[in-house]
Swiss-Prot record:
Site, as annotated: Interaction with DNA: 14
Claim: DNA-binding is one of the keywords in the record: yes
Organism: Methanothermobacter thermautotrophicus (strain ATCC 29096 / DSM 1053 / JCM 10044 / NBRC 100330 / Delta H) (Methanobacterium thermoautotrophicum)
Subcellular location per the Swiss-Prot or TrEMBL entry: Cytoplasm; Chromosome
Subunit structure: Homodimer or heterodimer with HmtB. Dimers then assemble into higher oligomers, with the DNA wrapped around the protein core.
UniProt similarity note: Belongs to the archaeal histone HMF family.
Pfam families referenced in this protein's UniProt entry, alphabetically: CBFD_NFYB_HMF
An example molecular function term from Gene Ontology annotations: protein heterodimerization activity
Protein task: Binds and compacts DNA (95 to 150 base pairs) to form nucleosome-like structures that contain positive DNA supercoils.
Keyword list, A-Z: Chromosome, Cytoplasm, DNA-binding
Organism lineage string: Archaea, Methanobacteriati, Methanobacteriota, Methanomada group, Methanobacteria
Descriptive protein name: DNA-binding protein HMt-1.2
Primary location class: cytoplasm
Amino acid sequence: MAELPIAPVGRIIKNAGAQRISDDAREALAKILEEKGEEIAKEAVKLAKHAGRKTVKASDIELAAKKL
């Protein structure tokens, strides 16, 4: 089961144009978002360390997302 709250994930799908969403679809998207988010976070940590920082900044996240 995904750790992300399901309601916001459902809103993301609704904002994309869906009228109805199954619980399985919400869970599947939440799982994928968590996996991708963790990949981006790990890359952002590497970028911050490379820059000599312990703090991950928004720019690290943005660069990591573009890189992946």
